[in-house]
Curated annotation (Swiss-Prot):
UniProt xrefs under InterPro entries: Ribosomal_uL6-like (IPR000702), Ribosomal_uL6-like_a/b-dom_sf (IPR036789), Ribosomal_uL6_a/b-dom (IPR020040), Ribosomal_uL6_bac-type (IPR019906), Ribosomal_uL6_CS (IPR002358)
NCBIfam families reported for this sequence: L6_bact
GO CC terms, sorted: cytosolic large ribosomal subunit
Keyword terms, alphabetized: Ribonucleoprotein, Ribosomal protein, RNA-binding, rRNA-binding
Function of the protein: This protein binds to the 23S rRNA, and is important in its secondary structure. It is located near the subunit interface in the base of the L7/L12 stalk, and near the tRNA binding site of the peptidyltransferase center.
Any GO BP: cytoplasmic translation
Gene coding for it: rplF
Summary of subunit composition and partner proteins: Part of the 50S ribosomal subunit.
Protein's name in the database: Large ribosomal subunit protein uL6
Family to which this protein belongs: Belongs to the universal ribosomal protein uL6 family.
SUPFAM superfamilies: Ribosomal protein L6
Domain of life per record: Bacteria
Length: 177
C-alpha cells in the first residue's frame, strides 16, 4: 500500500489555500488554481500543512487520497514556482514562432500549422527550433506540450520531429541491400 496520502503538503509563504466543502482553491504569486475533491477524501488545513484523509474505509479510498494529495502538491508547487516544458524541433526546415496566443509551426507539411495556446500558458521561442511552455497548471503545460509534439513525433531513422529536451529517441539502422 502506498503511503503518499499520509504525508502532509507543506504550504510555502505567499500561498493561500481556501477550502469550501469539496472544493479547494490555491492562490499564489504566479496564479490561482481550483479543483473539486473526490467524495471519499476529506482535506483539512493545520497551520501551514494540508492533510488528506479518507471519509470511510472503502475500497480505493486510500488510492483517491494519495491522488488528491499529489494533485494538491502540484497545485501548491505550480502557483509558487510554476512548471516548464521545453521542446526541440529537429529536421531540415522545421521552425517554430510564437505569435501572440498561437504558435506557428513549419514541420515539413504542405501547410503551416497554427496551434492555439490555451489560457494560462505562456509560449516562448528562444530560437527557431526551441519552444518553451510555462504555466502554473502542471496538467495543462504537459498536455499542451504533448499536443504540439503529436504534430510530428520523432521518427527512429533520422530522428526528425518534435521532441522534449530530455527525451531519448531510439534510433534504428536503415535497411541494407
Amino acid at each position: 500500500m502506498s503511503r503518499v496520502a499520509k504525508a502532509p503538503v507543506v504550504v510555502p509563504a505567499g500561498v493561500t489555500i481556501t477550502l469550501s466543502g469539496q472544493d479547494i482553491t490555491v492562490k499564489g504569486p504566479i496564479g490561482e488554481l481550483s479543483r473539486t475533491i473526490h467524495s471519499d477524501v476529506v482535506v483539512s488545513q493545520e497551520e501551514n500543512n494540508i492533510i488528506t484523509n479518507i471519509v470511510a474505509d472503502v475500497k480505493g479510498a486510500w488510492a483517491q487520497a494519495g491522488t488528491t494529495r499529489a494533485l494538491i502538491n502540484n497545485m501548491v508547487e505550480g502557483v509558487s514556482k510554476g512548471f516548464e516544458k521545453k521542446l526541440v524541433l529537429q529536421g531540415v526546415g522545421y521552425r517554430a514562432k510564437a505569435a501572440g496566443k498561437s504558435l506557428d509551426l513549419s514541420l515539413g507539411f504542405s501547410h503551416p500549422i497554427k496551434h492555439a495556446i490555451p489560457e494560462g500558458i505562456t509560449c516562448e521561442t528562444p530560437s527557431q527550433t526551441e519552444v518553451t511552455l510555462k504555466g502554473c497548471d502542471k496538467h495543462l503545460v504537459g498536455q499542451t506540450a504533448a499536443n504540439i509534439r503529436a504534430y510530428r513525433k520523432p521518427e527512429p531513422y533520422k530522428g526528425k520531429g518534435v521532441r522534449y529536451v530530455d527525451e531519448y529517441v531510439r534510433r534504428k539502422e536503415a535497411k541494407k541491400k
